[in-house]
């Protein structure tokens, strides 16, 4: 039996589509969510690193980059918990509630930035990361690798109001 080239192409395309449809996708359940200021674990086999993001805010720093929008900053810490770790700063993004996402300005080297050198177990590096915000105000930072959100830091919930005690009546 001879298969016509067009039929073979359609069969291959259908098989590829089924393979893509059946491929696993990362879901929101796969994302570790923490409040800004709390560490989030990034695990790759036996290697574990903790990223902590704090202080997401508009920046007044002078860096060798002219933003199109407003320059924002956060402080990032990466700690090698188990095994060595290489801080991949380029995977960090600021994100707004409406989904606007701003890639970290990883190509703009600054003295106050995160050192991208490999860390030995127990070592950590801390520095500022910057974003050019051209739309909605960011309220979170996400660590995204290969199109999948892995870690997410959000604004902490507001503190509960302090309980007030009425003074006891005097007798």
Feature-to-residue mapping (PLM):
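Conserved functional micro-motifs across diverse proteins
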Residues: 2-171
